């Protein structure tokens, strides 16, 4: 009896439909007739209050558990009119119960199949229900109501079980076979109830988990949005700071590069400037020395030739004894050897110079030695420039100084001076006749004179030492120098002549071109004048212009002749 009343209470509507399809109509009629006892008054009151108390929940939710109170009410209403019939037909019902109990055993596997289908359908319906109701509060309320309904359903079941037990105690007429079967039936009913409760709990657990996940997701979404907003704000705050830092770093790097470039340029500029100055200074004295050597190489040869000619005349005119002449000749040979030896030391072996010119070259060296201890490097460079640019002192000044500052000289030296006097005279004449000497050279000579006064004594000592050493060398080199000097002089003269000829030719060509232009202009003028004469009668002005034309041509020819004479 208890089993007949518990099945329609716990099984939902979906399972009832499946059971109806599986079970035959004869069985359903038997089950309806097997309900002799109605629900007690307490169960009926609870169902009424349950229907009145939760109308909203039945409207909102589509949970399969909401159909349970309606089913219970239907079952409660069914036994009302059947009460009298069941009381009349008790012995018939007992027989039917025995038959049902025998048939119940094969129907139990069908009930298990229905439960498996129910388990598969229930989670799908629950998922649809959760998708429709997204708000967590409504879902929590629905769960609470469902649990309350289940508890309410279990309470009348327990009451109903108690009533069944009382009825069984009051019915002593039941056969012994039935009484032995009742505890077994009770055990089966309890096992089924436990299974159903366990299934309901299993269905509720995924619902609670899904709700919990939904709540977590909803809580996490605003938190993630807040975190994103905070990160975005932080990035916005940090971006200007990063930009400023980058700009500052770039500016500092650019300044460092700019300063490095300036320092490099400043360090290179003085080096380049010094290099240029040194290069110019090194080239200027070389050019100046080359010019001096070329001039000096030409002058001493002429000077030596004139000396030899004058010495021969003096020997013929003198009536002194032969010993005196021998001494003079010996001294003259020694002097010539000294001159040649001294010229070799400062200059190349091909160049021929006088001893006085050698002294002039030694004087700046001594002067530089003194200045190196007194002045700095800059003054040394300036002095070197001056020394290279200065021209040699004239020969007259040296001769006069030697006469004044050498009173202790022997008679032989006096005779040498008397022989040098005509050379000095010739030097004067050469200086007077040299057109190439400029005012700048004279100023340099005047600046060069005080330096010679300082190194006179040292030069005398050097002359005596060089005199002894140069005797053996000069005799061998005289002939070679003479031949080489002539060849060099000839080559230099030829080169100079060629250069002068080229310049003159160019000048003549330019002048010829200018003359031709002037002639063309004159011809044009004459043609214009003729045209004017034809149109206008002749006047005094036109007559004056005609005799002037040949005069211009004459002046041009005279200028050409003068220029050619100057070139020659």
From Swiss-Prot:
Instruction: List the GO cellular component terms.
Output: cornified envelope; cytoplasm
Indicate whether NADP appears among the record's keywords.
no
One Pfam family matching this protein: Involucrin_N
What GO terms describe the biological role, i.e. biological process, of this protein? keratinization; keratinocyte differentiation; regulation of antibacterial peptide production; response to UV-B
Please describe the organ and tissue distribution of this protein's expression: Keratinocytes of epidermis and other stratified squamous epithelia.
Q: How the protein assembles, per its UniProt entry? A: Directly or indirectly cross-linked to cornifelin (CNFN).
- This protein is called Involucrin
